[in-house]
């Protein structure tokens, strides 16, 4: 977005016409989420990169938060079209400081309104504050210049409404003010308060669609490009698609991206069923750009130097000791040899067989094979065959966390065994039926024995070795284990099939500056 093909595409569209952001404004915000299996909930904790990103955001309190936000808002300002609008959603913890920041970037003369959004009817512990009950967020509305789009919104008059003189009122209704959800006619309650809303997707900071629809209708036109750079559950994208706008949404959290993707597929189906047009969308992963750092300029002596730096980095993150005098083996850890796969291509069957031959020659029986990607078909058949021939090979993914030096230094990088899907093809004449047989994962987040020791009384759900297990400890210290993942299908949230798949590389050419 700062400088590349995506920015060029935005500029070709004439720039962003509308930006809505709801940046994190609570210390301790994270990317964890709940997985529901068999009526029980297990927490899927955030990745190392996600955890560090928010830890850094609040490392020095408000100053580090504003530093993070300032850089991003400056970039958003540069991507915004002349006459474009931005809405920044925040609350009492940061609103004064954020407004000063927006004045700095956009200019105080381009401040249009401070919208006060009453969150909704509250009860229970939320109503037990020692003084006035806090019940609103702030949304700051700025524009880039004075020639901006604004489509005035109205609340329709109630059915049967007449003026004092008995006349039927003219016009579309009451013009909407800068205080929202403050009357029976203006219903914009928080999605968190509307407990039975069908919109809910289980995301902790989700905003309701009516709130975003009001903003998008007012400050953009059909076909305009709308963006949300703290995408969360994808509400902005979902509403923009329904209202005929083009959209871009970004998020650091994997669950946010997954939730948005799933939600947008649902929006497409909804629009298709209604006979309305909808657009295809793409999920772009920035994870490979860290790898690009090591691949750039790998020529002559620089190539060898970077290869050595890459091997050293991966071995350090894996807590392995480097070894020499081997062709395909690079390290040793806990009685197992370690092979570090290439940076720019998948680990292939040919490479695995070469590792196997060297192990047989050197009388080595245990190897961990680390890689960013693996050739299709390696798991489980090839590894099972080599295990039967005397070499126990385990394939593990190299996570993108390895490119964050803070995560490596703190020993927080985790390498997970490669998960794989087992499928069978049934061919009948000119028809092919694909049967999904199994999904094999050894994903581990907890240690059952450790959790049992620490659990004083009650229940806890843990994830270990591809299983979700509920532990229940009674007052006498007896622990009952219940496996909640009875079927491999319990791990699958949804399936997606690319019917237009083509087995060829997508090439994006970027002109040299």
Q: What residues fall within each predicted segment?
A:
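Accessory, often C-terminal, charged low-complexity segments
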Residues: 3-13, 17, 77, 92, ...
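Glycine-rich phosphate-binding "P-loop"
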Residues: 52-67, 197-203, 339-344
């Amino acid at each position: 977005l700062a400088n590349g093909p995506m920015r060029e595409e935005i500029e070709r569209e004439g720039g962003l016409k509308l930006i809505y952001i709801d940046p994190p404004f609570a210390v301790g915000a994270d990317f964890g989420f709940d997985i529901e299996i068999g009526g029980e909930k297990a927490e899927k904790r955030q990745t190392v990169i996600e955890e560090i990103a928010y830890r850094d955001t609040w490392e020095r309190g408000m100053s580090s938060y504003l530093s993070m936000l300032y850089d991003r808002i400056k970039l958003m300002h540069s991507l915004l079209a002349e006459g474009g609008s931005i809405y920044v959603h925040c609350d009492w913890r940061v609103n004064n400081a954020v407004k000063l920041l927006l004045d700095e970037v956009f200019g105080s003369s381009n401040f249009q309104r401070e919208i006060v959004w009453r969150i909704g009817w509250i009860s229970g512990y939320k109503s037990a504050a020692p003084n006035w009950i806090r019940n609103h967020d702030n949304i700051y509305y700025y524009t880039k210049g004075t020639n901006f789009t604004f489509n005035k919104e109205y609340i329709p008059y109630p059915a049967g409404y007449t003026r004092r003189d008995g006349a039927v009122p003219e016009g579309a209704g009451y013009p909407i003010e800068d205080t929202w959800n403050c009357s029976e006619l203006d219903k914009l309650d928080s999605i968190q308060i509307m407990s039975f809303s069908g919109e809910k997707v289980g995301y902790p900071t989700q905003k309701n669609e009516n709130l975003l629809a009001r903003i998008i209708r007012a400050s953009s036109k059909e076909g305009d490009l709308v963006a949300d750079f703290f995408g969360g559950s994808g509400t902005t994208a979902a509403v923009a698609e329904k209202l005929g706008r083009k959209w871009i949404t970004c998020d650091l959290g994997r669950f946010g991206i997954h939730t948005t993707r799933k939600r947008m597929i649902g929006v497409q189906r909804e629009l298709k069923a209604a006979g309305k047009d909808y657009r295809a969308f793409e999920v772009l992963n920035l994870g490979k750009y860290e790898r690009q750092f090591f691949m750039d300029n790998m020529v002559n002596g620089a190539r060898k130097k970077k290869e050595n730096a890459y091997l050293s980095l991966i071995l350090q993150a894996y807590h392995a000791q480097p070894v020499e005098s081997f062709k395909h083996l690079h390290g040793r850890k806990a009685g197992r040899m370690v092979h570090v796969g290439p940076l720019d291509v998948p680990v292939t069957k040919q490479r695995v067989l070469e590792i196997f031959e060297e192990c047989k020659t050197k009388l080595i029986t245990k190897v961990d094979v680390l890689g960013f990607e693996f050739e299709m078909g390696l798991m489980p058949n090839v590894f099972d065959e080599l295990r039967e021939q005397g070499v126990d090979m385990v394939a593990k993914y190299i996570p993108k966390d390895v490119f964050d030096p803070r995560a490596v230094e703190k020993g927080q990088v985790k390498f997970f065994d490669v998960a794989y899907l087992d499928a069978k093809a049934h061919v009948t004449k000119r028809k092919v039926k694909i049967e999904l047989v199994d999904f094999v994962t050894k994903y581990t987040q907890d240690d059952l024995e450790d959790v049992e020791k620490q659990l004083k009384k009650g229940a806890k759900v843990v994830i270990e070795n591809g299983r979700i297990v509920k532990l229940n400890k009674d007052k006498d210290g007896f622990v009952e284990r219940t496996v909640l993942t009875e079927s491999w299908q319990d791990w699958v949230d949804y399936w997606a099939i690319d019917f237009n798949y083509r087995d060829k590389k997508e090439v994006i050419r970027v002109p040299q500056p």
